[in-house]
Amino acid sequence: MSEEVVRSARPLTRRTVLQGALVAGAAFGASALGSSPAAAAGLTVTRMKVLAGTQAGVQYGIGATDLGIPARTPDGRLLFAFGDTWADAVGGTNWRSPVALYSSTTNLAAGVVFNGAAGAGANTQVTAPQLWYYPHDAYYETVIPSDVITIGSRMYLHAIVNGPTFGTVRWTELWQSDDSGATWQHTGLKFPADMADGHFQCITWGQGNDGYVYIYGTGFQRDKGIVLYRVPQNSMTSLSAYQPWGYANGGWAWGNPATEVLPGKFGEMCLRPLGGKWILTWFNADGYRIDAMVLNTPTDNLYTAAKTTLLWGGNWGAEDATHVAQLYGGYIIPGSTLSDLHLTVSQWNTGNNSVYHVEQFRIQGLV
């Protein structure tokens, strides 16, 4: 790969991780990449369109971006939260994170189209602003969105505060919006970086029908398995209300110390209730792919749960619909069904920064 073009004077842990995954995928070859928990032979996969970032054209001052975590807003639109974003290219001008765009798309099969930006003053600007102010400096390297959820008329965004370098988590925190994501306020809740032995840094969540929000958590370094928490939906801002699921005295129970419910090397995750089931999608850093599980409940035995590979990693210049170079993310777009799933998937060509974008994938036939 070519010499790195850095976005700051500090090292890029995410770049190192993605480069490692790409090398591993190339070294394993097609046979290893195909040895996932379940082959995706029954799936129909379509690369729909690049939504934002490189290869999408500049929209709302966004020329390079990743993640695109989607949520349904209280007013019925879609909101997509993005991570590190620049006006032109990685390491370029107007670095900000998180930013968010709106979509009124109702037919996902036609492709998501953005029609507005979130953030204070966004409706009077042509540039999507950082959702809240902080300086990208020696203390706050950057703040990355982890997941977004809507509970009633309020939205919550979990964010990962990095510093002094990317991948070193100072803490994570909870923000809220009462105007469908137009403006955001800090709830006052900060989660310690070492909560659950570092397994509550990158999280995903879904609202159950029992009054609880269920949360899978892992580290931000792609070297840990996942733990499970729950919190009453009306107590989101109270740290003491977050209950771990753990194994002790011969059994699993809420309130036991958090125990990994599945080992591995987890990256970005997306947990959602869908079609009477629960679905978890995640970037499997160990296998260089995006996997999925369909569950009856988040407390299912994940060791024995069926797992399906949705997308494999691949090499630049040798991609197809199911083999995607330097992929990560894999977030479920509202409006999906288990049999017709739409995901936002990120790519970053860490060798030359020519690709740093979010793409929409359609996956049919999972169930």
Residue ranges and their predicted role:
Residues 324:
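Short glycine-biased active-site loop of nucleotidyltransferases that positions the nucleotide triphosphate
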Residues 41-60, 72-141, 150-195, 210, ...:
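Beta-rich carbohydrate-recognition and catalytic domains
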Residues 22, 67-71, 175:
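Short, well-ordered alpha-helical packing segments
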Residues 66-69, 142-147, 200-204, 267-270, ...:
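Beta-propeller and closely related beta-sheet repeat lectin domains
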Residues 1-12, 21-31, 36-39:
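N-terminal secretory signal peptides
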